[in-house]
Amino acid sequence: IRDSSVTGVQTCALPIWVILLLGFFLGVIITISEPDLQVLAAQVPSVPNMVLILSVAAGVGAFLVVALLRILFGIALAPLLVVFYGVIFVIARFVPDNFLAVAFDSGGVTTGPMTVPFIMALGVGISAIRNDKHAENDSFGLVALCSIGPVLAVLLLGLVYPAQGSYVAADVPEAFNSVELGRLFLSEIPYYLKEIAGSLLPIVFFFGIFQLVSIQLHKKTLIKICVGLLYTYVGLVLFLTGANVGFIPAGNYLGTVMASLPCPWILVPVGMVIGYFIVKAEPAVYVLMKQVEELTDGEISGKAMQISLSVGVAASVGLSMLRVLTGIPIMYFLIPGYAIALFLTLFVPKIFTAIAFDSGGVASGPMTATFLLPLAQGACTAVGGDVVKDAFGVVAMVAMTPLITLQVLGLIYKIKSNKKEEMAEQPLLQAEDVFAGYADDAIIEL
């Protein structure tokens, strides 16, 4: 399902309007199937769950259409980002504070293990339609644009629905031995078997229609996709069971304990260490790293990218813990952060801008939603803060900082490339200086 060759086959023979219509419906279906979206919907009591889910899904679908148009017509990514983020911050000015953190969190939450691989593969497949030298570079940036849709959708809902700042703390299950712990996990597996099956069913149905009507893949390719689907199903069930049963209570408890210490400021450095390492556990990060290495022929190594992401996430978690302890409004961080990120787009190679804004959505995946957010919620409850305003926003912060760190990596890469070019030109200039005093027809004795 996530094979870019499949998307390439299904798009190359279709007119543009059909590609865009299918892109919209694919974006909606994939987003509805994203498990983390259900978690987000439960955190916004003033908006009905289905209204929020459908609005966010429509936002992703609409911006997936924008992203596909950008690829097909070779439109630059940076101006689009400046315009759309400008619109976001203008609308945010009129939205109640209780909606702001959740709105910006939604952009990171919806680009998770279901959405990212499919959207990136779709970008690679559609960019193959173009034959120019910039086509591969333009295959990045889909996740970046699709992350904008949910933020706008929730902000617009904030203009319609009244703000309600309620938060219900997660129950921390108790297990006194390994047998009880095993039962606790086993009791939750059936729920996630059903939830993930429901999430994958629309994708399988959509793919089945295309297989019968249009693409008609070979048996070997079909078996490969089915095996991949089985791996995806089993992996997501195990991952989400462990994350929701183990990580959410653990994060909440750890945050409560640390914030209750005589020196609650220990939250900031501990949060930074956790943030540095937790990004390595994000499933979608490895999908992005692999695709970046392949499309850049190893010029951007996975290791350098992972370090940049880890540093960015560490900084964002540290700032989030600072917000929890001090109650600083989230916009005091988001506005300067996005301003710096958008300013860097003027100097950084376009490929790095696209990868950086993609990585923001990728880094803020299920690990962030199931551990870092509960960590902040537990700490905020312990210090007596407003959980809706101060704890929410961790996902948004995690999605923002990689935009800066990866573009700084791109700036370093650009400087090094320029130095290499200058060093390569020096021998030629020296040779020209040696022969500068001779006429064109002069005889040079060796």
What are these regions (language model features)?
Residues 64, 87-95, 117-125, 333-355, ...:
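Hydrophobic alpha-helical segments of multi-pass membrane transport proteins
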Residues 94-102, 154-162, 239-246, 318-319, ...:
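Hydrophobic alpha-helical transmembrane segments in multi-pass integral membrane proteins
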Residues 1-12:
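Single conserved hydrophobic/aromatic residue that forms the stacking wall/gate
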Residues 13, 107, 130-249, 255-265, ...:
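Signature of multi-pass transmembrane helix bundles
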Residues 16-23, 83-94, 113-119, 145-154, ...:
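Small-residue-rich segments of transmembrane alpha-helices in multi-pass membrane proteins
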Residues 59-63, 117-125, 201-207, 270-277, ...:
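Hydrophobic cores of alpha-helical transmembrane segments in multi-pass inner/ER membrane proteins
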Residues 15-87, 264-345:
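Helix-loop-helix junctions within the multi-pass membrane cores of secondary transporters/permeases
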Residues 64-75, 99-102, 124-138, 213-219, ...:
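Alpha-helical transmembrane segments
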